[in-house]
């Protein structure tokens, strides 16, 4: 008959020292982490010469002069949980609305200036007092001239409009600005051909929807404008020198 009684001499207790044992996963992760750090340091060395240059985080606030060209102002009613189309340069039906409501009579850019970037700026203000809600916006940059977007869409992953209730979109294409000269003469000849030949040949066409996070229908005053980022050339040397010059 087996003996199940406890005997201290039968059992053995082994204590392993974990000083020389490490988790295999942590070893591999640490090795990869060190490798990535070394590769990152090598990549940063190639960028060291760029430390001597300054750039603006927001291209709208970067070097150059901003020239504003107001397109139109109007009031739109926006229902809750929906966003309304306010800017569409891909569909031809919006062109009539834009040109007939065009505000500016003169072009704010002279002949000798070069356009570096064009921003579409949408400013929104509530028309009713004592309203507490935030503005929402969505946009897309398209090329297809035959595309006609929906007038109203549901709110899906929108962006909250930031400071001063101003929604700003850079229309610059990837790779640089717009080396256009003598644009004042182009604008004076024909505004429609100026937009089609000069602006849309070098910049993207925007589609913009706006909405609110309000649970009621809201009335919004919208101002849409183009802001041209113009390169400022160095002035000519004065004819005279002295304390007044």
Swiss-Prot record:
Keyword Transferase in the entry? The reply is: no
Q: Give the superkingdom in one word.
A: Viruses
Any one cellular component term from GO for this entry?
viral occlusion body
**Cysteine-cysteine disulfides:** none
Annotated Pfam families: Polyhedrin
Q: Name one GO molecular function term.
A: structural molecule activity
**Which keywords has UniProt assigned to this entry?**
Viral occlusion body
| Annotated signal peptide | none
**Similarity-based family:** Belongs to the polyhedrin family.
Function, as annotated: Major component of the virus occlusion bodies, which are large proteinaceous structures (polyhedra), that protect the virus from the outside environment for extended periods until they are ingested by insect larvae.
Identification of the protein by name = Polyhedrin
């Amino acid at each position: 008959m087996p003996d199940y009684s406890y005997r201290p001499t039968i059992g053995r207790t082994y204590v392993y020292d974990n000083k020389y044992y490490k988790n295999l996963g942590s070893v591999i992760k640490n090795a990869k982490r060190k490798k990535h750090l070394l590769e990152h340091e090598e990549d940063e060395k190639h960028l060291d010469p760029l430390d001597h240059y300054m750039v603006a985080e927001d291209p709208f606030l970067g070097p150059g002069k901003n020239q504003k060209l107001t397109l139109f102002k109007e009031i739109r009613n926006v229902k809750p949980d929906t966003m309304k189309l306010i800017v569409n340069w891909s569909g031809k039906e919006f062109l009539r609305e834009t040109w007939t409501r065009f505000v500016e009579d003169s072009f704010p850019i002279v002949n000798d200036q070069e356009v570096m970037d064009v921003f579409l700026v949408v400013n929104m203000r509530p028309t009713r007092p004592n309203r507490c809600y935030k503005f929402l916006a969505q946009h897309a940059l398209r090329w297809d001239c035959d595309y006609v977007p929906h007038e109203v869409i549901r709110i899906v992953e929108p962006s909250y409009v930031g400071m001063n209730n101003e929604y700003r979109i850079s229309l610059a294409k990837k790779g640089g600005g717009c080396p256009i000269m003598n644009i004042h003469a182009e604008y004076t000849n024909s505004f429609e051909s100026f937009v089609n030949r000069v602006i849309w040949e070098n910049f993207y066409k925007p589609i913009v929807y706006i909405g609110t996070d309000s649970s009621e229908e809201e009335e919004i005053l919208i101002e849409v404008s183009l802001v041209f980022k113009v390169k400022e050339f160095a002035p000519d040397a004065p004819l005279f020198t002295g304390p007044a010059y």
